[in-house]
């Protein structure tokens, strides 16, 4: 047992005691110990395999319902899957709203914790910034359509929104000279 413990501590989790080296009942006890160790390692490997699937976004598999005190493993993986599914659903909901032109939608930050809450808050900021900047463009175009060629996009814009603001203001200025 000492050698098995040493091997497992060193990362050699496949190591087993040679039960054939022990006669009779001792050999049977060793074999039963090997089976016990193998069963514990099998559960760990199931957890690892499932975590690897979840890590790449494959939520199609579940952890089998484990008995007794091992049930905490099933419960933990079920919770991980549920939380990953919830953040995925929230992202898809916001993406669908944005694709449909509804930038007023916001994610439920309070429904998540830690980095998931940060992700939803970041998506909310993206939706809000995009909605606000496009509202500026819309107001300016509406003003120009109503004949107000003095309309300008004013405010702090960045990136593509700064370029749009500059182009819109230049367009209004050019139209005013006609």
Language model regions located:
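Polar/charged heptad-repeat coiled-coil helices used as signal-transmission/dimerization stalks
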Residues: 2-177
